[in-house]
Amino acid sequence: MDSAIQSAKRIIIKVGSSLVTNDGKGLDTAAIQKWAEQIVQLRALGKEVVLVSSGAIAEGMQRLGFDKRPTGVHELQACAAVGQMGLAQIYETSFRQHQVQTAQILLTHADLADRERYLNARSTLFTLLQLGVVPIINENDTVVTDEIKFGDNDTLGALVANLIEADALIILTDQRGLFSADPRKDPHATFIHEAQAGDVELEAMAGGAGSSLGRGGMLTKILAAKRAALSGAHTVIAWGREEQVLTRLAAGEAIGTQLTAQTAQLTARKQWMADHLHTAGRIVLDQGAVLKLTAEGKSLLPIGVIEVSGSFGRGDVITCVDQSGRAIARGITNYTSSEARRIMRKPSTDILSILGFVEEPELIHRDNLVLL
């Protein structure tokens, strides 16, 4: 297979906690130094690298004397706050040995959901890369709650790939890559060297406790690859303990599973809409409206809406679902939730008589709508 990493100019590398900590108890300085060495070698090949690294909570636990991971939200946030200092210090020291500057960037979903903050983060990252800096990104665990978390750094890595239009996403994990079934349980499981990002069969294999691949965190990686593919980024899932894995990938060696992006690249504006993990509201569409959106590329009219939930204002991003609850699209609404409830199931010609004004004949214009 063609190596997505060898030809990539801009790469996001996600390193999981198990690869930068001592069995979850504090940071592994030697391991981090090796990652820094490999990234420096990638930069020498002319590649721009952004690192998404876990490990802050594990380091904070050690510094604060926790024997096991706390269950309280505030204790976890305290561990993250303390541990992030150590994580930044070790990365800075490791890269400065090679005369490379690093930058710490902590993101939340709110940063990427707000259009202005999204563009600011994008501009900052581009500027850092132009200055030859290696940005090191993590979720800002000190301020987020479960309801607004990215959920995992696989997802964060994909969102950053989209944010700066990276060519490739490398997800380093404690497994070799993807198998057709859980190799720990099925001796006939075969290794998947290459597949298409967004392959529904692959998602089905990895989904849920009863799936053939088991849980094992692989579904989040498959979904991250699907998300990264929206901006044209290819994904490689590889074993992080593989010797010199990054430099060998950059040299064109086939390691791990490569999930290839084959979908049309979204515009930057539509990419921003697609990357909303949490939207302001949800509307349910009838079958006719679903077909108009998915098969004909039409705008969404009020007559095709059968239910409105949530509280949203004009200009908010909302999710469109079919009657089974499956997400079909996201888009920027022309009407508030209360207005949408009044005009749903009505023809656009009735909007003026119902509301006393007409913003637009469409609830969501097709230029402000992205299919999922």
Curated annotation (Swiss-Prot):
Pfam families: AA_kinase, PUA. GO terms for cellular component: cytosol. One of its GO terms (molecular function) is ATP binding. It catalyses: L-glutamate + ATP = L-glutamyl 5-phosphate + ADP. Keywords: Amino-acid biosynthesis, ATP-binding, Cytoplasm, Kinase, Nucleotide-binding, Proline biosynthesis, Transferase. The keyword Kinase applies. It is an enzyme of class 2 (transferase). Its EC number is 2.7.2.11. ATP binds at K14, T173, D174. Substrate binds at S54, D141, N153. One of its GO terms (biological process) is L-proline biosynthetic process. Gene3D superfamilies: Acetylglutamate kinase-like (3.40.1160.10), PUA domain (2.30.130.10). CDD domains: AAK_G5K_ProB (cd04242), PUA_G5K (cd21157). SUPFAM superfamilies: Carbamate kinase-like, PUA domain-like. Pathway: Amino-acid biosynthesis; L-proline biosynthesis; L-glutamate 5-semialdehyde from L-glutamate: step 1/2. Residues 280-358 form the PUA domain. It is found in: Cytoplasm. PROSITE patterns: GLUTAMATE_5_KINASE, PUA. Catalyzes the transfer of a phosphate group to glutamate to form L-glutamate 5-phosphate. Belongs to the glutamate 5-kinase family. NCBIfam families: proB. This is Glutamate 5-kinase. It comes from Herminiimonas arsenicoxydans.
